[in-house]
Amino acid sequence: MILKSQQVRSLSPEMDPLRMGMGWTVDDLSKPQIMVESTYGNSHPGSGHLNIFVEEAVRGVNDHGGKAARYFATDMCDGMAQGHDGINYSLAHREAITNLVEAQANATTFDGGVFISSCDKAMPAMLMSIGRMKDMMAAIVVTGGVMEAYDLPAKYTENDPGCAINELLTLEQIGKFSAQYERGEIPAEQLTYYKQHACPSCGACSFMGTASTMQVMAEALGLMLPGTALMPATAPELKQAAYDAGAQLMKLVEAGVTAGDIVDMRSFENAIMVHAAISGSTNALMHVPAIAHEFGFEIDADTFDRMHRGAHYLLNIRPAGDWPAQYFYYAGGVPRIMEEIKSMLHLDAKTVTGKTLGENLEELKKNGFYEHCDALLAEKSKKIGREIKRTDIIRSFDEPIGTNGSIAILRGNLAPEGCVIKHTACPKAMFKATLTARPFDCEEDAIDAILHGRIHPGDAVFIRYEGPRGSGMPEMFYTGEAICSDPTLASSVALITDGRFSGASRGPVIGHVSPEAAAGGPIALVEEGDIIELDVEARRLEITGVKGEHKTPEEMDAILAERKANWKGFTSKYTHGLLKLYSQHAVSAMKGAYME
């Protein structure tokens, strides 16, 4: 087999001296050239430690006959971008990273790549770039794991100081505590203490948000070594996993196996079934279709809805559950989930080990993986002074938390192309509700109304012009937390938007409303006092009346048509730069919100 790197080398006589200018030896030039791409940088805790794993992967490659080159595409942090216009760049920067990695890989041809990241947009961006290069190189993914939870002193535990779960502080709680402070419910000193200890280590945030979900998706797609997603970032096993990934990549290069030889539609269907079992972030409904698109497959939100129906939901991890995300690994991680739901998986799907998914699961049972996880869980039990069973974290298939997956796609005259709700994080009281519309054209106005008592039980808070072609589809996390942290609103008010939500979001929050307001979707036509009907089980979201008076479907159609005729249209505020490009070229959120 003639390596692609050697073919290009013969076409570019400057390549050899340029590489030797960085310390390559003459012998290095003829070795398989491997790209070790990461999002390392001081942008946030999910990327600030990745250089450790970069060096391990480089060593794994070099020790097994390759020559590794370090490349970087530092990502932004959605958490740091919350609450200001920086969050508008979030989805656009997924596209920017994908484009940068594609350019880096093609400008200097490589034979394989190790792709290392941790968080919300970096994980899908890496997977999208692998899809673009699916027939060009071998690929394997390493994640930066998950941060630790902080053990709070008893005086800071909420509600019950004896409850070990509440003593474990994780970042997604800060939005709630901030809203409590704004309402005068906790002092500034207490909020400061929470902030000081919410991120006690590097790694992805310790809840099943978008970062954790996408780490799990990478393993479920077969692109990671089994059992390596969501390891604690400080665990020595993660360093070993990075080294092993570099070594395994060299086997794939030698065998001529590319990512396109591994990932197929079975891989994506497996990932979606795992998503249902873990109650994964709703943002995966944009990321997985975007990744599939790059691999040449078409998946949309309806695929998720269909596969989630009847799926067993097993994972008791925050924000929908009780435990921090680090406990997922202690309970057996992705392999344990797959073992429980294997009757619903394609066990013949290929993976980067060179074996099928089914073969990987059998090997893990033989090599002591689960015993190792059990020992870690026992150690954690001892530390917090409470026995934790594996089934406290990952239920068995026969005793699930629920049997209808975790998300639903709703439709109706308000969302003809659909919208998404994470029903596992929604109070049952809100599964069927009649609400009064309270529309806002930006998140800041909505938050102000909530925090100052202008939103009441039975209201439906609308935030619009926040879709891909509007403001770039930012997260509405703070608005959701402002509602959920208020006991009078948490089970009586819905939040509906053409924007999206953080993976940490909880409560009756409905996002990705399509068509979006900027495209003239019905959400742009909602007026104060409209009657909104929500029915999760029937998958319906409708405008059924105006000013408190119900209308027939035909009457509502006529009213909406008249409003549309008077709609003044939308003019983007972005006149240059990345957000102009993204807002002009992004497809619907229901398709993946990628640029075309």
What name fits each language-model region?
Residues 1-46, 55-73, 79, 85-90, ...:
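Catalytic or ion-coupling anion/metal-binding cores of large enzyme and transporter domains
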Residues 49:
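Glycine-/small-residue-enriched capping loops at alpha/beta junctions
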Residues 52:
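Acidic/charged coordination and interface sites in well-structured regions
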Residues 90-98:
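Well-ordered mid-protein domain cores that form the structural environment of catalytic cofactors
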Residues 105-126, 139-142:
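A short, small-residue-rich loop immediately preceding and capping a beta-strand
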